[in-house]
UniProtKB/Swiss-Prot annotation:
This is NADH-quinone oxidoreductase subunit B. The keyword Transport applies. Binds 1 [4Fe-4S] cluster. It holds the Pfam family Oxidored_q6. It comes from the Bacteria. [4Fe-4S] cluster binds at residues 39-40, 104, 135. It is a peripheral membrane protein.
């Protein structure tokens, strides 16, 4: 028996904070954009299928970064692809979150030692909120990572002062040319 089933009388009052209402709305309508680069993308597609039914969690995949609040990076990120990852990340509206899926996007995977062209983790170019380990991770692991993102959203504070909000935005900003040059120098290319 829920609130709407019981009927609303004239003298009922519902008390909560604005943070709780807004966070509940955001975590109940999470719109991820998948950035599938390798075999992890197959597992991401399997997770989006009817067997796992992500829509029961309020998760509805989008294909445009301007409509997404979560980027799922799934697979090997090369130096050339890093620029596109940064560009898509910058096109997403705030608040935005990143989930790194699989060992290739987490740390370079099996290519990290001898692959001069492979980024040694997507967290070197954009801030990552949740890492999902595995090669490739099972759909259950991805769902667990998505639920971790929802927990992060649940605990967020919306009513920050302007100075705190600007500081938070500055921490998440990315200079693509600096990052690409730094990675190329580290790889010796």
């Amino acid at each position: 028996m829920g609130l709407l089933d019981a009927g609303i009388t004239q003298h009922n009052v519902l008390i909560t904070s604005v943070d709780n209402v807004l966070n509940w709305a955001r975590l109940s309508s999470l719109w991820p954009m998948g950035f599938g680069l390798a075999c992890c993308a197959i597992e991401m597609m399997a997770t989006n299928a009817s067997n796992y039914d992500l829509e029961r969690f309020g998760i509805f995949p989008r294909s445009s970064p301007r409509q997404s609040d979560l980027m799922i990076v799934a697979g090997t990120v090369t130096m050339k692809m890093a620029e596109r990852v940064i560009r898509l990340y910058e096109q997403m509206p705030e608040p935005r979150y990143v989930l790194s899926m699989g060992s290739c996007s987490n740390c370079g995977g099996p290519y990290w030692e001898h692959g001069y062209h492979v980024l040694k983790g997507v967290d070197r170019v954009i801030p990552v909120d949740v890492f999902v380990p595995g090669c490739p991770p099972r759909p259950e692991s991805l769902i667990g990572g998505l639920m971790k993102v929802q927990e992060l959203i649940r605990m967020e504070q919306i009513g920050l002062s302007r100075a705190d909000a600007l500081k938070k935005l500055a921490e998440k900003s990315v200079d693509p040319q600096f990052v690409i040059e730094r990675e190329r120098k580290a790889a010796g290319a």
